[in-house]
């Protein structure tokens, strides 16, 4: 992929695990593996399960695979899909400590908190940053991970040799909806802050299409491209 990563200085952000009590309800049918993630999930029905919500689209934190391995976990609501990544391994450790079966549920980012509050999942492990607004509706654990945000541009971009975020003044910059990847853009003076998109793959696609000059992405995810 003809991308270049520049500037790992936007923001050092703590990535936290959200934990709340389990709920009850009905179960939804499985999705096709190629279908987009739904914003709802099967409700928690068995206390023997530890149900974790994530996007399964955010490597290396969490992503989706099509074949079982010794380390990935089946995605309950996507037929033939398996979740892998750092967040999945954290979830496995927690499930083992709790003595419960780990169940991974694929959800869109903006559906995670609602699913947690409705009792459809027991936890969000998806690189969600602790904010005052989110604390109004969910609880957070201690940090399990730290990350640094970066700017990603295409190779050959006029911004390729930028050394400061202020070098992106006048640039059209894109972030992910409902995340700090979008919120931090306003730190850049004179920036053209584009309407955010729903996922990191969507941001990458927009960058490749040339509809933005740069995207905000954390360093570890940028290294996957």
Where are the predicted features?
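Alpha-to-beta junction loops
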Residues: 99-101, 117-126, 171-172, 208-221
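Flexible hinge/capping segments at coil-to-helix
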Residues: 71-72, 154-172
């Amino acid at each position: 992929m003809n991308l270049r990563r520049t500037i790992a200085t936007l923001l050092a952000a703590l990535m936290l695990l959200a934990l709340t009590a389990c709920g009850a309800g009905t179960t939804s049918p499985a999705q096709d593996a190629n279908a987009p993630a739904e914003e709802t999930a099967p409700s928690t029905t068995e206390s023997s399960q530890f149900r974790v919500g994530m996007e399964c689209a955010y490597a290396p934190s969490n992503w989706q695979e099509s074949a079982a391995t010794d380390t990935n976990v089946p995605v309950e609501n996507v037929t033939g899909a398996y979740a892998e990544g750092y967040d999945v391994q954290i979830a496995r450790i927690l499930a083992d400590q709790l003595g419960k079966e780990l169940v991974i549920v694929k959800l869109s980012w903006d559906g995670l908190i609602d699913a947690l509050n409705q009792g459809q999942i027991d936890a969000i492990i998806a690189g969600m940053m602790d904010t005052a607004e989110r604390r109004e509706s969910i609880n957070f654990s201690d940090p399990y991970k730290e990350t640094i945000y970066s700017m990603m541009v295409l190779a050959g971009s006029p911004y390729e040799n930028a050394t400061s975020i202020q070098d992106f003044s006048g640039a059209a910059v894109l972030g992910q909806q409902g995340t700090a990847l979008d919120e931090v853009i306003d730190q850049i003076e004179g920036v053209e802050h584009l309407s955010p998109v729903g996922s990191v793959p969507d941001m990458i696609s927009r960058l490749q299409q040339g509809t933005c000059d740069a995207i905000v992405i954390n360093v570890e995810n940028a290294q996957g491209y």
